[in-house]
Swiss-Prot record:
Compositional bias annotation for Polar residues: 677-696
Entry keyword annotation includes Ligase: yes
Organismal lineage: Eukaryota, Metazoa, Ecdysozoa, Nematoda, Chromadorea
GO biological process: microtubule cytoskeleton organization; protein polyglutamylation; response to hermaphrodite contact
E.C. no: 6.-.-.-
Gene: ttll-11
Tissue: Expressed in amphid sensory neurons. Weakly expressed in body wall muscles. Isoform a: Specifically expressed in ciliated sensory neurons in the head, including the IL1s, OLQ, head CEP, and amphid neurons. In the male tail, expressed in HOA, RnA, and phasmid neurons. Isoform b: Specifically expressed in male and hermaphrodite IL2 ciliated sensory neurons, and in male-specific CEM, HOB and RnB ciliated sensory neurons.
Keyword annotations from UniProtKB, A to Z: ATP-binding, Cell projection, Ligase, Nucleotide-binding
Chief site of localization: other
Protein known as: Tubulin polyglutamylase ttll-11
A Pfam family this chain is assigned to: TTL
Length: 707
């Protein structure tokens, strides 16, 4: 039996990892360029059979539709007959990593011209990049390749564009993006939600409810509020003989590694009054032969929340320190080049290794995720299992952030029908020595630049340098942006279906496509892939719905003391916490979240409201075994109590099944699909496009103020 090397991957695996598949050398019915992709890791699942059936039905439906299209266009195609015993010579594939790297397109896009020569609709899609700033080069390049008309200075005719690409979340987004049919690449409030402390609050709430599911995040303390808790943890660890514990201090507003330092005692914190995060340091990272610490930047895409759809990019980045790692001690803990993987920090070190070619990056300070997966695989690491676990981290982290994403969307587009928001996210993951992935941070605006600065000979980077092409960034970011645009415009299936060719009659273009064998750079991981595995974590949206009934969404996203008192009265919880005691409890919770004992009229954020719910649930349902069961009982109790006011929290989320292909879609804000906010002329609207927004104001049921 012969052995062929395949770099093709199914959409659930990182690009470029190497797999072997045995093919008989004389078996002309199975050309070597059609080798079966590597199979992704599967753990025993209970309810995934339904999702597999859905996927199969969807595949069969697409194939039938494709056959119809090919049949209709067959008389217009230039055909090339290929006899079974005269198959075209396949692309040469070598088992060496170098040959694979050499055969890959340097830009991350197919070598063939991909500029669309035809429209997929009655008009061409448009994109506004006037606020893209540093993202503009890559976005413009991808737009051109896809055939999107770009407006780098905005449209002079004041007509809306199909896509708006911004480099940051703009406070006046609702004034810039006025059409519900448009797509914009940022969710309102996402910058704040992804900050270190806000992210920690989101994950901490889920850890209380699902401790085993959220063990991938290090122990964390928010200062100054949690200083006493941090001291208590440290004393307990010392009593248990853990004398070599180290912690990492991160300013909440910090970025690119600024202001970060290591400590091994609470007494070493430089400013206990500063708003900052202290995390347990991962002192046992997985290392390779070069003994350099590294982490992964994995890219996720939230396609929409209506319906909810989360994707992962098959290719990511591995970022390496520039000095060899040793466990921190009093002699080396200040050497950040050995402890922090941040590119912005390490690029200033003379030991930083830039990569001019894909072959160079196998030893560079910035490498492809797939390259490192191959290197780890050769050392016996089970990379399929690792990739499976990393994707679950992306899903679980996004679900933890989801309630507040919904809240900020409703607040920002309170008086308007909002557009479809989508967002590329960067998830920083480190691997422990035992192969366990740990989430470090989430970046709401990961860099999409595809170049870097190389210092002039004999000078340091601080003295300036020359901006040159970054081959690693190109291979990662160009397909990422390109496929994200295809995804939100509904062009993904059309583009990649052309690679699944049947029959013996192929056009010349089809033969070129066979050689390229491109696969989608993005694959859906929720709800399609991991819906059965993680669907139970989609839980706190009911709490968010109740929360929004008592918040003045037009002007605020926090709940005031008056709102909490109204919640206690209308949910019949006065026997648990009398209204006169609410203010004292609010002060206690507010200090835990802000470090201030007085609310100053700002109210409590959502996760502080959750702490209030947890407190009530613990007191009201003492016979339940765990907090999750108690909170479930409390939410059901509140739901029943609020029905007399015309409110049902169970209506927040709505799942719909497409009867044609059996695909399940979960709408997190179904009220935006139905009626206007005032409740007048409340009739169901037809969907107009993927925005899932009707041509009317969104509706969120309000509580009847009459008791």
């Amino acid at each position: 039996m012969g052995c062929k090397i395949s770099t093709e991957f199914c959409s659930d695996n990182p690009v470029g990892s190497i797999s072997t598949s045995k093919v008989h050398p004389t078996d002309l019915s199975t050309p070597s360029y059609a080798i079966k992709p590597v199979e992704f890791y599967e753990e025993p699942l209970k309810d995934d059979q339904l999702f597999y059936k859905v996927a199969l039905a969807k595949k069969e439906y697409r194939e039938k539709e494709k056959d119809k299209k090919e049949q209709l266009s067959s008389n217009r195609r230039v055909s090339l007959q290929v006899e079974p015993n005269k198959l075209p010579i396949p692309l040469t594939r070598s088992s060496s990593l170098s040959s694979i790297m050499e055969n890959r397109p340097p830009s991350g896009i197919s070598n063939s011209s991909f500029i669309r020569s035809r429209n997929t609709a009655s008009r061409r899609f448009t994109i506004d990049t006037s606020r893209a700033k540093s993202n503009q080069y890559v976005v413009s390049l991808c737009s051109k390749k896809i055939g999107i008309i770009e407006y780098p200075d905005g449209r002079s005719d004041k007509q809306p564009c199909d896509v708006y690409w911004h480099n940051v979340v703009l406070s006046d987004m609702n004034k810039i993006v006025t059409s519900p049919q448009s797509r914009v690449n940022k969710f309102p409030g996402m910058t704040e939600l992804a900050k270190k402390i806000s992210l920690t609050h989101s994950i901490s709430s889920m850890q209380k409810l699902f401790p085993d599911e959220y063990a991938f995040y290090p122990n964390s303390w928010f200062l100054p509020a949690h200083l006493a808790d941090f001291h208590a943890f440290y004393r307990k660890a010392q009593a248990l003989g853990k004398t070599e514990m180290w912690f990492i201090v991160k300013p909440d507003e910090g970025a690119q590694g600024t202001g970060i330092y290591l400590i091994n005692s609470p007494n070493q914190i430089r400013n206990v009054d500063q708003r900052q995060l202290v995390q347990e340091y991962v002192a046992d990272p997985l290392l390779m032969n070069d003994k350099l610490k590294f982490d992964f930047r994995v890219y996720g895409v939230i396609k929409s929340i209506n319906p909810l759809s989360i994707y992962v990019a098959r290719e990511g980045m591995a970022r390496f320190c520039t000095e060899k790692y040793e466990k921190p001690d009093s002699s080396n803990f200040k050497n950040l080049y050995a402890h922090l993987t941040n590119y912005s920090l390490n690029k200033a070190n003379e030991a930083y290794v830039h990569s001019n070619t894909l072959q160079d990056q196998t030893r560079g300070s910035k490498r492809l995720l797939s390259t490192v997966f191959h290197q780890l695989e050769s050392r016996g690491v089970k990379t399929k299992r690792l990739w499976h676990d990393i994707k679950l981290i992306l899903v679980k982290t996004t679900l933890a952030m989801l309630p507040e994403i919904m809240l900020h969307y409703e607040h920002h587009f309170y008086d308007s029908t909002g557009p479809q928001c989508f967002q590329i996210m960067g998830f920083d993951v480190m691997i422990r020595e035992d192969g366990t992935p740990i989430l470090l941070e989430v970046n709401a605006a990961p860099s999409l630049t595809a170049d870097h600065i190389v210092p002039h000979p004999g000078r340091t980077l601080l003295e300036g340098g020359q901006r040159v092409r970054s081959i690693v960034d190109e291979v990662i970011k160009i397909p990422l942006v390109r496929d994200t645009l295809l995804l939100v415009l509904g062009l993904m299936e059309e583009e990649y279906q052309n690679n699944s060719l049947k029959g013996e009659t192929k056009s010349l273009d089809d033969m070129q496509t066979i050689k390229q064998r491109r696969k989608p750079h993005l694959s859906e991981i929720f709800p399609t892939r991991y819906g059965a595995h993680s669907g139970h974590l989609l839980f706190l949206d009911k709490a968010m719905y109740i929360y929004m009934q008592f918040v003045q969404l037009r002007s605020n996203v926090n709940i005031t003391n008056a709102g909490l008192k109204q919640f206690v009265r209308k949910c019949n919880l006065i026997d648990i916490i009398p209204v006169v005691h609410v203010d004292a409890k609010v002060s206690e919770i507010n200090y835990y979240f802000t470090g201030e004992k007085r609310t100053n009229g700002n109210g409590l954020p959502f996760h502080a409201f959750l702490m209030f719910l947890f407190f009530i649930a613990e007191k009201k349902f003492v016979l339940e075994n765990d907090l999750l069961s108690k909170v479930q009982r409390l939410l059901s109790f509140c739901d029943m109590s609020l029905r007399r006011y015309g409110v049902r929290s169970a209506r927040l989320r709505r799942a719909e099944v497409d009867s044609t292909i059996g695909n399940v879609e979960i709408y997190m804000l179904p009220s935006r699909m139905a009626r206007n906010r005032s409740g007048t002329n409340g009739r169901k609207q037809n969907f107009t496009d993927d925005n899932n927004n009707p041509n009317s104001f969104a509706h969120l049921p309000k509580i009847n103020e009459r008791l």
